[in-house]
Amino acid sequence: MRITAEIKPIPLGRPRLNTTNRGRYLPKSSIEFREKLQWILRSAYSGKPLENSLSVTLHFYKPTKITAKNYGDVDNLAKAVLDAANGILWLDDSQIIELHGYKHKGEGKIEIEVIEND
């Protein structure tokens, strides 16, 4: 399966500590990104979540120079997508046995390729 999400990729933010409630929370930008990406994924894929082991390739496109400082680490970019796809494309990201992530300069989008292994 191949899905192109026309959304500017952002890395998953680190959980913050709330001293008032003594809890942890994700930054607002991470939550908004996840919700938008989930809506895109649900629109693009209406099947049941895949149940077997998976190989996933992710291509991240941003219109900025490719550096960790202004682009984010590829593992944090991938984690944001993998978490958003839980329960939509697959049951849980623990099913992924092979993962490839690539950063490119270009218009803001994410290309997701999922291969179900037997």
Region spans (language model):
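Acidic, proline/glycine-enriched N-terminal capping motif
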Residues: 1-118
